[in-house]
């Protein structure tokens, strides 16, 4: 049995857990939260009926899941060479030959095509934004910037921040300041989140010759960059003034807590890995808490 036959044989036994790894389901699920929040705010602020908007929300969530999962699968296809070098990636089905390249590409493009069809069925802006997200993530991030510049994380933050725009346009069919504010929050959140992870894995990235900021410029430059994005994030809740003073205060406190944690990195003899772990965990909690606040406070305003 040749290698291609072996790969095809292995791919027939791909488990659901492995499929989740291929499409990076954890990343996808995290992006569905701001996507839903975008739709929810469009419903509340434009006085749409939630019940009558459920079909659009479901189509948006399914379409977004498919295009993000498909783009991530294509990213895994392209990154097989570097993933095979990095110790933390050894259990990926694309590395241990649990799925053939042919089946991986069929899965990837199939998901993206169906997802885009659903988004375009909603309206043209949703489909176009989804397409821009795919092109940005696959071409400008995965293929180009990830391997060639320390700005890769910032460049990848543009396509990574489109979910709330898709969510909003799925309901309203246009882009508003509120939608842009949600986009900016996700955009600023990503460098902090991924730099924290990159600090923990800087040796792996160096081994794979990936120019992540901590690997190329070191910890000092990285923590300054993270602090910069924390400062930029600080005033963004004020762009969501339509949610009221309570939201602005709570979101600002959330930002200040993260800013304080960022400042602790400038203490003498900081344990870099321990600090990066704290920043990474805070970033995960931040994403959930911020968008839950968006939904809950806007819900309270309805009554």
UniProtKB/Swiss-Prot annotation:
Protein name per Swiss-Prot or TrEMBL: Protoheme IX farnesyltransferase
Places the protein is found: Cell membrane
Membrane topology note: Multi-pass membrane protein
Gene Ontology biological process terms, A to Z: heme O biosynthetic process
GO-annotated molecular function: protoheme IX farnesyltransferase activity
First and last residue of the signal peptide: none
Function per UniProt: Converts heme B (protoheme IX) to heme O by substitution of the vinyl group on carbon 2 of heme B porphyrin ring with a hydroxyethyl farnesyl side group.
InterPro entries documented for this protein: Protohaem_IX_farnesylTrfase, UbiA_prenyltransferase, UbiA_sf
HAMAP family: CyoE_CtaB
Transmembrane region(s): 25-45, 54-74, 118-138, 151-171, 177-197, 230-250, 280-300
Biological source species: Staphylococcus saprophyticus subsp. saprophyticus (strain ATCC 15305 / DSM 20229 / NCIMB 8711 / NCTC 7292 / S-41)
Gene3D superfamilies, alphabetized: UbiA prenyltransferase
Cellular component per GO, a single term: plasma membrane
Similarity remark: Belongs to the UbiA prenyltransferase family. Protoheme IX farnesyltransferase subfamily.
Pathway given in the UniProt record: Porphyrin-containing compound metabolism; heme O biosynthesis; heme O from protoheme: step 1/1
């Amino acid at each position: 049995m040749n290698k291609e036959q072996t790969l095809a044989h292995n791919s027939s036994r791909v488990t659901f857990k492995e499929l989740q790894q291929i499409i990076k389901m954890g990343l996808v699920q995290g992006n569905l939260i701001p996507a839903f929040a975008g739709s929810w705010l469009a419903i509340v602020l434009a006085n749409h009926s939630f019940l009558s908007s459920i079909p659009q929300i479901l189509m948006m969530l399914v379409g977004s899941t498919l295009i993000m999962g498909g783009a991530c699968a294509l990213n895994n296809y392209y990154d097989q060479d570097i993933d095979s070098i990095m110790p933390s990636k050894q259990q990926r089905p694309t590395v241990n030959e649990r799925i053939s390249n042919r089946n991986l590409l069929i899965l990837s493009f199939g998901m993206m095509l169906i997802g885009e069809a659903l988004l375009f069925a909603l309206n043209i802006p949703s489909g176009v934004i989804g397409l821009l997200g795919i092109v940005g993530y696959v071409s400008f991030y995965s293929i180009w910037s990830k391997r060639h510049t320390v700005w890769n994380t910032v460049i990848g933050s543009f396509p990574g921040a489109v979910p709330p725009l898709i969510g909003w346009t799925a309901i309203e069919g246009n882009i508003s300041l509120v939608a842009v504010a949600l986009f900016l929050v996700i955009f600023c959140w990503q460098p902090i989140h991924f730099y924290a992870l990159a600090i923990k894995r800087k040796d792996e990235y160096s081994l794979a010759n990936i120019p992540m900021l901590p690997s190329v410029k070191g910890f000092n430059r990285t923590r300054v960059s993270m602090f910069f994005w924390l400062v930029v994030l600080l005033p963004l809740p004020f762009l969501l003034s339509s949610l009221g003073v309570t939201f602005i205060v709570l979101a600002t406190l959330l930002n200040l807590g993260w800013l304080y944690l960022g400042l602790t990195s400038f203490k003498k003899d900081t344990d870099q890995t321990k600090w990066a772990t704290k920043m990474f965990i805070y970033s995960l909690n931040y994403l959930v808490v911020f968008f839950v606040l968006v939904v809950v406070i806007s819900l309270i305003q309805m009554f």
